A protein has these predicted regions:
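Bacterial N-terminal signal peptides that target proteins for export
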Residues: 1-23
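Sec/Tat signal peptide C-region and signal peptidase I cleavage site
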Residues: 17-18, 22-23, 28-35
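Bilobed "Venus flytrap"/periplasmic-binding protein-like clamshell domains
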Residues: 39-72, 132-201, 302, 315, ...
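Pocket-flanking alpha-helical
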Residues: 54-60, 74-117, 193-199, 213-222
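Ligand-binding pocket segment of bilobal, Venus flytrap-like solute-binding proteins
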Residues: 91-95, 184-246
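A structural signal for short loop-to-beta-strand junctions that line the ligand-binding cleft
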Residues: 115-130, 258-267
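Periplasmic-binding protein-like
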Residues: 168, 294-312
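C-terminal lobe and pocket-closing loops
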Residues: 228-289, 332
Length: 340
């Protein structure tokens, strides 16, 4: 049995942007499935992001520890579209979230022109939730920007425009400081890779990324430069509570997480939940075995990847929005006592 290590994957995907290639190159994905193996398909978001690495980790642990099943991972694209493909039966797993799944079930927002979305949602179940990771608002250590309130006139990478991360970061800034994107500060148009590169090159004042610490982007940045994470002067009040709603929650980013991190005290930010969806029609026994294979072998990950310590069974099986656990996953969570 191989020992799973993710440090090489994180470094590789930061430079190549290819998740599947990164996994194969580091030698941590199981070798090609034999003729009798069941090969399942997973799609996730940009491969350099922590959430994609979490999902690749899941696939890798299952493939390493469950005979007869291999999970192939492809990175890139939007989770909103991946969910539709799970519903159609073209994918077996994808990323999900309470908000996105609720919208898909109702045929609203990005799904308003997708007449089949509510019906397809019935073929999308939940395997587990995990923390998205606190949103990190990073500046260089010598920046005059000390808090989010100081961002007036700044150039910022919030995430790809129109995406969930962009809207989440924009909303947190506006609810805590009153600063409005496009009026009080500029948000550059870039994808994840070019947005990070803009920060490396000093072309933006603030770089935003939600991730479980330690994050590959900040590990890489602090190899050669110093940074600070910033938060709002005040993270309380009615506007903030309204913004957080049911699915987001305040989170703290500790000091001393990175060798070049110059914060003297923890910083307040926010977090949310994302999850791994699974095709409802995938048989219960298979999903049970997959769920069990991951959680029974999670120690293979946490020993080398400190961020994985944020994954826990209670969070994984919690009720969030309309998403229902796949019966196979629910069986495992009941066995270990986290689901009644």
């Amino acid at each position: 049995m191989r020992k799973t290590t993710l440090a090489a994957l994180a470094a590789f995907t930061l430079t190549t942007g290819t998740l599947t290639t990164g996994i194969l190159a580091t030698g941590i994905l199981a070798t090609a499935a034999s003729a009798e193996d069941m090969t399942l398909k997973m799609a996730t978001i940009a491969p350099s992001l922590g959430q994609a690495i979490t999902m690749a980790t899941f696939a890798n642990v299952v493939t390493d520890n469950l005979d007869g099943i291999s999970i192939e991972v492809s990175g890139g694209g939007a989770a909103t579209l991946h969910l539709m493909e799970v519903g159609r039966g073209n994918l077996d797993f994808s990323m999900t979230s309470p908000v996105i799944y609720n919208l898909m079930s109702a045929g609203k927002a990005m799904y308003k022109n997708e007449a089949e979305a509510p019906e397809l949602a019935k073929n999308v179940s939940l395997l587990m939730w995990f923390p998205y990771g606190a949103y990190h608002f990073a500046v260089r250590a010598d920046s005059d920007i000390q808090t989010l309130d100081d961002m007036e006139g700044a150039s910022v990478f919030l995430g790809p425009q129109g995406g969930g991360a962009y809207n989440a970061a924009r909303g947190w800034i506006e609810s805590t400081t009153g600063l409005v994107v496009g009026e009080d500060y500029e948000a550059i148009k870039a994808n994840w890779q070019t947005g990070y590169q803009a920060f490396l090159d000093g072309k933006v004042d603030v770089y935003v990324n939600g991730c479980l610490d330690p994050c590959g982007q900040f590990i890489q940045f602090t190899e050669t430069e110093e940074l600070r994470f910033i938060g709002p002067m005040d993270a309380t009040g009615e506007a903030v509570d309204k913004y957080l709603g049911k699915w987001r929650y305040r989170a703290e980013i500790g000091n001393g997480l990175y060798k070049g991190q110059m914060n003297e005290a923890p910083v307040t930010s926010f977090d949310t939940a994302v999850g791994i969806s699974v095709r409802t029609e995938l048989d219960d026994e298979t999903v049970y075995k997959i769920t069990k294979a991951f959680w029974d072998n999670i120690d293979q990950v946490t020993s080398d990847s400190p961020w994985a310590k944020a994954l826990n069974l209670e969070f994984a099986a919690s009720k969030r929005g309309l998403h229902e656990l796949h019966p196979g996953a629910a069986r495992y969570y009941k066995e270990v006592g986290v689901l009644k």
